[in-house]
Amino acid sequence: MEVEKIMQALEQKHPGEAEYLQAVKEVLESVKDVYNQHPEFEKAKLIERIVEPERVITFRVPWVDDKGEVHVNIGYRVQFNSAIGPYKGGLRFHPSVNLSILKFLGFEQTFKNALTTLPMGGGKGGSDFSIRGRSDNEVMRFCQSFMTELYRVIGPDEDIPAGDIGVGAREIGYLFGMYKKLTHEWSGMMTGKGLEWGGSRIRPEATGYGALYFVDKMLHTHGHDIKGKTVAISGFGNVAWGAAKKATELGAKVITISGPDGYIYDPAGLDDEKIEYMLELRASGNDVCQPYADEFPEATFVAGKKPWEVKCDIALPCATQNELNGDDADMLLTNKPLCVAEVSNMGCTAEAAEKFIAAKMLFAPGKAVNAGGVATSGLEMTQNAIRLSWSDAEVDEKLHGIMHNIHEQCVKYGKQPDGYIDYVKGANIAGFMKVANAMMAQGIV
């Protein structure tokens, strides 16, 4: 495999799609040595097929606001790869949404889902719509219009969306309700549903919980205990909340959260009351974290900066893609944390990730660390299919086992001759080989 040649061809085909090209290059660099041991892959043009989505659906989403004004947004669904199961991946409603971001997320999702060992392919979708400042009725009308087109290409055995940034329990409810009205059927065609109508226990916390199970295992493998360690978290949304909750439960001290307006430094650490307040911050819809410092005066709000300047043992980017850049990496390396783990999808820029790996720091990629969310979605799909509901303890036990299995796969494929574990390479190779073998078995399709 000639990575540069492949990337040049992709750049010509997809100019300006920076996030997608970044994600593809990271995987290709990781798997090239293994790929080159399989001439049958080259003959079948496996790489050329695996980097392109099977299908991309784009549609307009017209809706009317509370003043009677008509708006038109763009809706997308990227059905990336179905080799190991129906397409599975979230919906994101945010002004930054574009095809490049959704293709990167769908590509990553393909390998992340493979790591869980559950039968799920990769997909992603969403719209450039923002829920910020919109009333419940406006959000409902938008979701209903969005589903009027999306329902044609999804279903429990075809494509199962879930939530993501801007798509929480409220939005999933509106989307599910419209799907049910249009199709005259109740099915497990979405995950992240409410407990009263087919949802799974601990699904809201699952991404954060799974991330901490992975980090805990990573630390233990290298002779460290998470108990008593300080944790810097970015974001204050669903993922950050779950991560803070589980980190505190495991005995660590979470000392930061952040938002677009800056970050909160709380040296005393987040307790149950403060973690629950994160839900109030999110529910306010204002997308700022500063009110935390008003509510808890012992904490400090630092405007316009990221939390990576704070000395910590564990750094967990939990907000969005490429939030931790090369300069942030330099700052973290100076403060010498034990590990950095991407809880957000591709939370570190390529430059930052390269610096962590070059310094032999414990660094784990999002496709492994945050797989707990989609793993629990897979468990929700199973519960819907067998018409049963498992308890918190049953779901948590299964999630724990899945995350430990993902860690073992990363170690198996990522251990270097000098003993260093390259978790990025390990995760990419493990996920890639499962998808590649499935594609080879199914012929040129």
Task: Name the predicted role of every residue range.
Residues E2-A23, M218, L333-V445:
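Adenosine-phosphate binding glycine-rich loop
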Residues T191-G194, G199-K311:
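Glycine-rich phosphate/diphosphate-binding loop of Rossmann-like nucleotide-binding domains
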Residues L21, Q37-A44, T117, I154-G163, ...:
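Flexible, glycine/charged-enriched surface loops at secondary-structure junctions
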Residues M1, P15, E19-Q22, E26, ...:
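Conserved active-site and cofactor/substrate-binding residues in soluble primary-metabolism enzymes
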Residues G262-F363, A368:
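Rossmann-like adenosine-cofactor binding region
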Residues E40-H71:
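Structured beta-strand/loop patches that form or line metal/cofactor-binding pockets in enzymes
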Residues H94, N113-K227:
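Glycine/serine-rich phosphate-binding loop and adjoining beta1-alpha1 elements at the start
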